[in-house]
Amino acid sequence: MSKPIDLKTVKIFEPLKKKPSFENKIFNTLNSDLVYEVLSNNSNETVNLWFKLQQSWCNNAYSTFKDYDSYLILVYLVNQVFQKYSDRFQYLTFQEFYEKTELNIDKINLIEISKELNIPKETIRRKVNFLQDQNIIFRKGKSIFFNNAINRVQKPSNSKKMMANFLEKTSSILGKEDWFGRPFTKEEIEKFLDSYFTICWQHWLRLQIPFLVRHRTFFGDLETWNVWGAIGISQFTDYSKQVKGRVVEDPRTYADLYLHLLRHTPKNGINASSISEISTIPRATVIEIKYLLK
């Protein structure tokens, strides 16, 4: 069972400190449909930064254990810790979170993790034992904890910067709409991510984990997906160079851009060595993934 909240020391997320008022019914919210429409119609400007963010995060994920499934289970457990803070209306800064010597996970439910990640229960068991062997998690009494090894295996310093770059661009695009307000700089965004880290990264992992699970289910494993993604990034780079300077009549939606990429024939292909360099997956493994050619 979780420990009770110490009301003397609990740190409440700033927006929640504002006293509700029936007289003042101004809420700082955005219409998600409008946001999606604007960003979708400007996909040409954002997709490159999105690819860089995903590639950076995925490369770090693979490099940590040379095994995507172990890392996926790790971030799932980390997100449980984030969720626990959120449920208590608490948050930690980036520095505070990674300065902790241990973090309580409470318990690990193999069946629940297996269902959420679409990975067999016995595989989950082996990967959790691997994390324990690596001294990343440990048991104390009836509870399970992360120790401070989390600092070296799951500290998204570079991904945080990449995300700030991506959000700066989306902010710049949305800032042209009268309902959005002023755009934000990457420095402001990264400072916000640092200050409200466990809240922000919980939202990121709520997007990222299902995103990875979908691709793992479709491709069979995330290594194959990352190889496919490296080829896609190469094709997008070639496409961008060829269309640069063209007069484009209308903004392309993400769906339109995706179709253009599928129809595009690049001037130059990409070899196994380059795919390995982009994805950090060994060249021998890249060569073994042959069914993408079919």
Where are these regions (language model features)?
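N-terminal leader segment of winged-helix/HTH proteins
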Residues: 2-71, 176-229
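Short helix-coil-helix linker/hinge
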Residues: 64-71, 80-95, 218-224, 234-257
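Short glycine/proline-centered loop/turn elements that form peptide/ligand docking sites
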Residues: 87-93, 99, 105-108, 125-126, ...
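A short alpha-helical element within helix-turn-helix/winged-helix DNA-binding domains
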Residues: 96-115, 262, 268-278
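Short amphipathic alpha-helical interaction segments
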Residues: 118-133, 280-292
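A short, conserved structural fragment
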Residues: 132-142, 294
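Short, Lys/Arg-rich nucleic-acid/phosphate-binding segment
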Residues: 140-151
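Short, amphipathic alpha-helical interaction segments positioned at domain boundaries
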Residues: 152-182
